[in-house]
Amino acid sequence: MGQKVNPVGIRLGIVKDHNSVWYADKKNYSDHLLTDIKVREFLMKKLEKASVSKVIIERPPQNAKITIHTARPGIVIGKKGEDVDRLRQEVGELMKVPVHINIEEIRKPDLDAKLVASGVAGQLERRVMFRRAMKRAVQNAMRQGAKGIKIQVGGRLGGAEIARTEWYREGRVPLHTLRADIDYATHEAHTTYGVIGVKVWIFKGEILGGIEQVRAEKKAAKKKSSK
């Protein structure tokens, strides 16, 4: 049977950029990688209620720059920026270098695969019927302008004895088209019956200019936000 490759991994360098942006020699590479994993795990746990989608880690010489993409920046920043200062200290201790933290707001959380997946998982944990949770998420994404979306849940659905997989799709989700901008994420729902896996694919359109276009758009967005 044909197997599905990770849609983000296969598009790296084509229409997707890496979440860790640094270069290291053989001696330091594994340490940097392990630190990145620890930092991401720490931030995801600490900012559980802040709807964090992804954490981008850059390592200029002698310091580190972390960009947190979140749908609720107020929770990350805290009162008068107290929380983000504390966060900077804690992450600095983990990375053993001075850390600069940027917060980027996700304006359309219904078009972010990670947030959609965690939203569906949260509903499953609150015992919402899985079909209703999937349908609601799909409708919200299509309303926000997605070209296509597919949601898949797998496990003991509705407390069934035998685990199974169900999915729901609307619009186009062209996994073989490498220029297609497909956001993919997974999440786990921990229910009384066991773990239910949630997978989300969101197709946002085609990027004809390749990775250069993606980077140029990111740069323009950064300039706009810094003004």
UniProtKB/Swiss-Prot annotation:
Which Pfam families is this protein grouped with?
Answer: KH_2, Ribosomal_S3_C
> What GO CC annotations are associated with the protein?
cytosolic small ribosomal subunit
| Keywords in alphabetical order | Ribonucleoprotein, Ribosomal protein, RNA-binding, rRNA-binding
What are this entry's molecular-function GO terms? mRNA binding; rRNA binding; structural constituent of ribosome
Which intervals hold domain KH type-2?
A: 39-107
Q: Which GO terms describe its biological process?
A: translation
Q: How does it assemble?
A: Part of the 30S ribosomal subunit. Forms a tight complex with proteins S10 and S14.
HAMAP family membership: Ribosomal_uS3_B
Q: What does this protein do?
A: Binds the lower part of the 30S subunit head. Binds mRNA in the 70S ribosome, positioning it for translation.
So what family is this one in? Belongs to the universal ribosomal protein uS3 family.
- For this entry, the protein name equals Small ribosomal subunit protein uS3
Q: What is the protein's species of origin? A: Hahella chejuensis (strain KCTC 2396)
Report which gene this protein is encoded by.
rpsC
